[in-house]
């Protein structure tokens, strides 16, 4: 079975900046995607957030562009629509941006897991789309 996962912005940042305790698992996820062993989805707004945040770390523009190009080689971008924003704004999520990411993933067809490093921000997520950290996903994948 080829898993379809939706990655939150922070998973990309953890991998790129080698930050947090699970950046190696994030790296493993993107290696699987590069090898076509899993399918990765993310939102267009997530990529924009990533580019902006990378700029605040003073990462050279050329490196940002190269990373963006690499992401697009193994990630399918999904655009949130009006319904996604309406659901996010009326949801119990504390952070609207997190809600937009989650409801964008729900809108997509057949996403198996939502992957985020900030799992505590997704406690109000529905049970129809499980939320995993990169480590939890890799444990599930390797079963």
Regions found by a protein language model. Name each.
Residues 1-42, 56-62, 132, 137-143:
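Short, well-structured N-terminal submotif of metal-dependent ribonuclease cores
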Residues 12, 48-50, 121-123:
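Short, active-site-adjacent cap segments at secondary-structure transitions
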Residues 12, 18, 99-102, 125:
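A generic signature of intrinsically disordered, low-complexity regions enriched in glycine/proline
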Residues 8, 98, 118:
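Acidic active-site catalytic centers that drive phospho-/nucleotidyl reactions
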């Amino acid at each position: 079975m080829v898993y379809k996962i939706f990655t939150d912005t922070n998973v990309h940042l953890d991998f790129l900046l080698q930050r947090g305790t699970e950046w190696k698992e994030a790296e493993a996820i993107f290696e699987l995607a590069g090898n076509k062993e899993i399918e990765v989805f993310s939102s267009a707004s997530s990529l924009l957030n990533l580019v902006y945040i990378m700029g605040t770390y003073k990462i050279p523009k050329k490196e940002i562009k190269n990373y963006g190009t690499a992401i697009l080689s193994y990630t399918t971008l999904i655009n949130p629509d009006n319904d996604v924003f309406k659901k996010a704004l009326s949801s119990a999520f504390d952070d609207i941006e997190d809600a937009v990411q989650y409801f964008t993933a729900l809108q997509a067809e057949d996403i198996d897991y939502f992957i985020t490093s900030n799992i505590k921000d997704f406690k109000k997520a529905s049970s129809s789309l499980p939320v995993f950290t990169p480590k939890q996903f890799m444990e599930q994948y390797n079963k």
